[in-house]
Every structure is written in C-alpha cells, then in structure tokens.
Amino acid sequence: MAMTIEVKDELSRLAVKSISARRAEVTSLLRFAGGLHIVGGRVVIEAEVDLENIARRLRKDIFDLYGYNAVVHVLSASGIRKSVRYVLRVANDGEALARQTGLLDMRGRPVRGLPAQVVGGSLIDAEAVWRGAFLAHGSLTEPGRSSALEVSCPGLEAALALVGAARKLGVNAKAREVRGADRVVVRDGEAIGVLLTRMGAQDTRLVWEERRMRREVRATANRLANFDDANLRRSARAAIAAAARAERALEILGDTVPDHLASAGKLRVEYRQASLEELGRLADPPMTKDAVAGRIRRLLSMADRKAKVEGIPDTESAVTPDLLEDA
C-alpha cells in the first residue's frame, strides 16, 4: 500500500503542459474513478479518489480545461471504509462535461470503454490515460515474487482500452477477471519500471527499482547458500558411505590387503567426514587427493571381487539407509 500512495502522490503533483494529455487524463480519471448518474433528470458526474491531492488536481483541470466547477466532499473513515475518501461531483454541468470528455457519445449514450479520440491519441495521451487510471484505481505492490502494477476497471471495454494504451507505450499488460471484477495487470519488473516512468513517477520508480534489486540480491545469496549447503550434505554423505565401504573392505580382505591400500582405507574409516584432500594431508607421507581416491577405489574393487568369489556381502552392503539418514 505504501508504494501505491507514493506513486499517486508523485503523479498528483506532476506538471503536464500538453492540453490533449491533460484532457486524456481527466477523461481516464473520471472513467475509472466514477460514473454517470441521473439525479432529478440531470446527468451528474462523480469520481471517488483516495488522496486529497488527486481530488484537487482533478477539480483544477476540469475548471481550467472545461470551465466547470466541481465540488469535493470528504467521506470520513468509518465502518467498512478503512480510510478517508474524496468524492468530486459535477452536478449543474454534468451532461456538458460528460459530452466534452467523451463519456457520453453524440447521441447522449454512455461510452463503455474510453472515447475514440483518447484511444487514438498520441503517446503522451496514452501516458495520460494510464496516469488517470492509476490515480483513480491503481495499485503497486512491493517488489517480490508476486509484485504487480494493476488497475481495477469499471468494465471489460475500459480494461481493453487500457491494455491498448500500454501496448502503445511498449508495455505488455493483461486484462483479467478477478472475483468478478475486471483488472489490468503488469507483472514483469522491467515493464513496471517503464510504465512508472511513462506515467511520470520517476522518483518512485527509482525507489522501487532499488528495492527490487536488493530483493534479487538477497534471493540470489539465499539460493547460493542453499546450493552450498546441499553440496556439503552430499559430500558428507558420500564420505560416510565411502568410510563404511572401506571398513567392510578391510574386514573382507583381512591380512591379504596390501599395506598402501590398507593405510588409505584406515584413514577413510578414521576420518569419516574428511574430504579426500584432507585425507591426503593426513597420510604419511602426504599424497594428493587423486592418489587417495585411487587407492580407496582399488581397495573396494579388490574386496568386492573377493566377496563375489566367496559369496559373502560386498562393500555396498555396509551402506544402509539408516547410515545415510544420520549423515
């Protein structure tokens, strides 16, 4: 929620010079935040937002661009309403504003998505469409496995118009129906960053990107730590299994085992969890890990051949599930 407020606060303070972009933002904000109502036979426009800055911006733009006065009502937090809400209302000139913004078509019928002049506008108009939609009903989650930038939409047509505006900006957005409500969602981290900048929330994007990078670094470090732990566990199990086999090999061969193979086997049995390199340093005289491995391999091979001839359990029989479970 904190990131959402940061984005909306930054966008609500953004200065926009283009008249067409300001008009597109107003149309989008009204479409996604409110609706048209018939009150006493007149068309009334209402838009409900969650920040006072947004309400002030919308009221100013409506007056500057269209010359109509809007009234802002404050709804205090109570009951199911967890926070203060601001409702902007245009009553006396509601129909005129609805026609000029394209919320009503030439025949006075409500437009279900966004008006053609907004959908077919320039790149800065597409940015304004997203800015208005986000100010109305957008959210940005913290960077993570399920991070997303999304907008709740008043209907499928509005959602598809928003997807088209994102495509124009080079961003892949998807329209989804979640619990009966239409939403437009952007999940890719790079795409979220691009869209934040396009809307005008560059400062918030930098904060979001920094948090995303920190999280990725932590995730990578955790994966490497888990990988190292797994490797250590595998190495320990292999060493314990080799020690058990070496001990069985010495039992099978008895006095017939050559001295150099016996010494390597005894080292393996005595230092069960040591690496081959460590065993090599413990040998007298010291030897390489390859030499140690070779001697243990020949010891096991010799013992297994003798066990096969005599029909007795070989060295593999010493490696039991219980032994590895305790490793």
Swiss-Prot record:
Signal peptide coordinates: none
Keyword field: Cell cycle, Cell division, DNA-binding
Domain of life, per lineage: Bacteria
A GO molecular function held by the record: DNA binding
DNA-binding region of this protein: 275-308
InterPro entries named among the record's database cross-references: Homing_endonucl, Sporu_reg_WhiA_N_dom, Sporulation_regulator_WhiA, Sporulation_regulator_WhiA_C, WhiA_LAGLIDADG_dom
Alphabetical GO biological process terms: cell division; regulation of sporulation
Gene3D superfamilies referenced in this protein's UniProt entry, alphabetically: Homing endonucleases (3.10.28.10)
Function statement: Involved in cell division and chromosome segregation.
Family: Belongs to the WhiA family.
Cited PANTHER family: CELL DIVISION PROTEIN WHIA-RELATED (PTHR37307:SF1)
Protein known as: Probable cell division protein WhiA
